[in-house]
UniProtKB/Swiss-Prot annotation:
Annotated pathway: Porphyrin-containing compound metabolism; protoporphyrin-IX biosynthesis; coproporphyrinogen-III from 5-aminolevulinate: step 2/4
Similarity annotation: Belongs to the HMBS family.
Subunit field text: Monomer.
A GO BP annotation: protoporphyrinogen IX biosynthetic process
GO molecular function: hydroxymethylbilane synthase activity
Organism encoding this protein: Bacillus licheniformis (strain ATCC 14580 / DSM 13 / JCM 2505 / CCUG 7422 / NBRC 12200 / NCIMB 9375 / NCTC 10341 / NRRL NRS-1264 / Gibson 46)
Remarks, miscellaneous: The porphobilinogen subunits are added to the dipyrromethane group.
Record-given protein name: Porphobilinogen deaminase
Catalytic reactions on record: 4 porphobilinogen + H2O = hydroxymethylbilane + 4 NH4(+)
C-alpha cells in the first residue's frame, strides 16, 4: 500500500479538481491511498493586480513543482491553461483526462447577450485574451479587471458596477453550477479559448513509473493530442501571459487535427488568426505559429512585450 501525497492550491476549484482526480485514481487502483497537501502559489498571494503584470506563465504551478522536485509531494493536478509550455527537468505531464467544455461564457445582469449589452457596458475579466477578443467585437465596451474565485466574481457582478463577466465554462461546471446561470456560451469562432482551457494536467516526476502506469489508464487520447497541438503552438509563439494569445484544436475521426491560433494586441485592434490541419500535433502547432509569425504575429508579440517593459521602466 503506497500513500501518494498530492499537491494542490487552496482554491475551491483546485481542491474540487484534485479530489475528482483522486476519486478516479482510487477506482483504478484501490491499493493506493491519497493525501492532499495544500500549497500557496504566487498567483494566489497577489490578488490586487492583473495576472499579466505579476509575471509569466507558471504563477499557479511553480511552488507546487518545486515541492514535487524536492520529494515533498508526489503529484499534482493543475488546470492545463496555467501550465508553462516547458516543464522543469525531471517533471512531466503523466496524464490528461477527458476535457470539459473549453468555451468561455458570458454571465450578465438582466441576462443580456454580448450583442445586446448597452453601449459602453462594463465587462469584468482578468484575462488579456478575453478582453482583446471582446474589444475586437465590441470596441465600445469598458473592460474592468476582476480577480478572485468563481463565487467571488459572481458576487461582484451582483454587488458592483459590472454589467457582465466572462468565465470559463469548465470551471463553472466543475464547481457544480448549472448551465442556467450562464447567459451565453461564447463560440470559439467569436472568442477563441486559452490553450488547454477545460483540460486538466496531472503532473509527476518522470522517474515515478508506478504513478505513470496508473495515470496512463486515466488519459484521454483525443484530449492529449489536441492539447499537445495547442501547447506546441503556444511554445513556438513564446507568448507568455503578457500577450493575448489563444489556441483551440479539434480532431476528426481520421485523426486529422485542426488547430486555430490567435494572437492579438491588448486593445483588440490588431488580430492574427490562422487555422492549420495535419496529423502530427507538434507539427501542426509549430506550423500554425510559423504561418502567423510570417504574417506579423511574432512582431506584434515582441512589440507588446517591449511596450510593457518600457511602461514598467
Amino acid at each position: 500500500m503506497r500513500n501518494i501525497i498530492v499537491g494542490s492550491r487552496r482554491s475551491k476549484l483546485a481542491m474540487t479538481q484534485t479530489k475528482w482526480v483522486i476519486k478516479k485514481l482510487e477506482e483504478l487502483n484501490p491499493d493506493f491511498t491519497f493525501e492532499i497537501k495544500e500549497i500557496v502559489t504566487k498567483g494566489d498571494r497577489i490578488l490586487d493586480v492583473t495576472l499579466s503584470k505579476v509575471g509569466g506563465k507558471g504563477l499557479f504551478v511553480k511552488e507546487i513543482e518545486q515541492a514535487m522536485l524536492s520529494g515533498e509531494i508526489d503529484m499534482a493536478v493543475h488546470s492545463m491553461k496555467d501550465m508553462p509550455s516547458v516543464l522543469p527537468e525531471g517533471l512531466m505531464v503523466g496524464c490528461i483526462p477527458k476535457r470539459e467544455d473549453a468555451r468561455d461564457v458570458l454571465i450578465s445582469k438582466g441576462r443580456q447577450k454580448l450583442a445586446d449589452l448597452k453601449q459602453g457596458a462594463v465587462v469584468g475579466t482578468s484575462s488579456l485574451r478575453r478582453s482583446a477578443q471582446l474589444l475586437q467585437m465590441r470596441p465600445d465596451l469598458e473592460i474592468k479587471w476582476i480577480r478572485g474565485n468563481i463565487d467571488t466574481r459572481l458576487k461582484k457582478l451582483e454587488t458592483e458596477d459590472y454589467d457582465a463577466i466572462i468565465l470559463a465554462a469548465a470551471g463553472l461546471s466543475r464547481m457544480g453550477w448549472k448551465d442556467d446561470v450562464v447567459t451565453e456560451f461564447l463560440d470559439p469562432e467569436s472568442c477563441l479559448p486559452a490553450v488547454g482551457q477545460g483540460a486538466l494536467a496531472i503532473e509527476c516526476r518522470g522517474s515515478d513509473e508506478e504513478l505513470l502506469s496508473l495515470f496512463s489508464r486515466l488519459n484521454d487520447r483525443y484530449t492529449q493530442l489536441t492539447v499537445t497541438a495547442e501547447r506546441a503552438f503556444l511554445h513556438a509563439m513564446e507568448g507568455g501571459c503578457q500577450v493575448p494569445i489563444a489556441g483551440f484544436a479539434k480532431m476528426d475521426e481520421d485523426g486529422v487535427i485542426e488547430l486555430t491560433g490567435l494572437v492579438a494586441s491588448p486593445d483588440g485592434k490588431t488580430v492574427y488568426r490562422e487555422t492549420v490541419k495535419g496529423k502530427d500535433p507538434e507539427a501542426v502547432g509549430r506550423e500554425c505559429a510559423a504561418v502567423m509569425s510570417e504574417k506579423g504575429a511574432k512582431a506584434l508579440i515582441d512589440r507588446v512585450k517591449q511596450e510593457l517593459e518600457d511602461h514598467e521602466a
